[in-house]
Amino acid sequence: MKTFQLKGFRRDFLGKKAVKAYRKESLIPCVLYGGNENVIHFNVFRENLRKLVYTPDVFIVNLCIEEKLYLSILKEIQFHPVNDEILHVDFLRIFKNKPVIIEIPVVLEGLAEGIKAGGKLCSEMRKLKVKGFYKDFPERLVINVENLELGKTIQVGKLSFDNLELLNAKDNVVASVKLTRTARSTVSQ
C-alpha cells in the first residue's frame, strides 16, 4: 500500500473561534485518535492535504507532529456544504499488531463473456470495506470478470482475498453484466 508523508502542528487552542482563525491561515484542523493513546489535536496546511484527499487511492499516512511519527489512515473528512472546502480531517492511529477496518478501491480486470455477447459491464461498488493488518492491505482489490456472463453478477460473498476479511453484506453486488437495448432486440428476434 502507498504511504503519504504529512507534517502537522499541534493546536494550542480548541473551539470555534480558534478553528476559524486557523482556517483563515490556510490551516485545516485535524485530530488523531485510536488505541489507548491520548487524542492529538493538530493542524495541517490545506495544500498538503490535496494529494491525500482528492485521489481514489488509499494511503498509510506517516504523520509527523512535533518531530514524533505516527502511523495512521484517513478516517473521515468534513467538507463545507456550499464551497466544498475541507473543514476537518480525522486520522485513525494504526498499530502493527491490531487489525484495522478500511475501504479499499475495487478494480475490475478482464473482458467479460457477457460483454462479448452484447452486454454492458456495470461496476456497482467502487470500494469494499475490509478488516486486516495494514501490512496486508493491497493498493487495490483486483477482481477478474472474464467468466461473468450476460445477466450475471459478482457478489461480495463470492470474493476472498488473502489475509483480509470482507465486511460488506454478502449479497451486495460488486459487478454485473446487464443486457443493453441492442442485445435485447437481438435476443427477442
Swiss-Prot record:
RNA-binding recorded as keyword: yes
One GO molecular-function entry: 5S rRNA binding
Domain of life where this protein originates: Bacteria
GO biological process annotation, one example: translation
Residues that span the membrane, as ranges: none
Any GO CC annotation of this UniProt entry: cytosolic large ribosomal subunit
UniProt xrefs under CDD domains: Ribosomal_L25_TL5_CTC
Keywords: Ribonucleoprotein, Ribosomal protein, RNA-binding, rRNA-binding
Protein family (similarity comment): Belongs to the bacterial ribosomal protein bL25 family. CTC subfamily.
HAMAP family, sorted: Ribosomal_bL25_CTC
Name this protein carries in UniProt: Large ribosomal subunit protein bL25
Organism per entry: Azobacteroides pseudotrichonymphae genomovar. CFP2
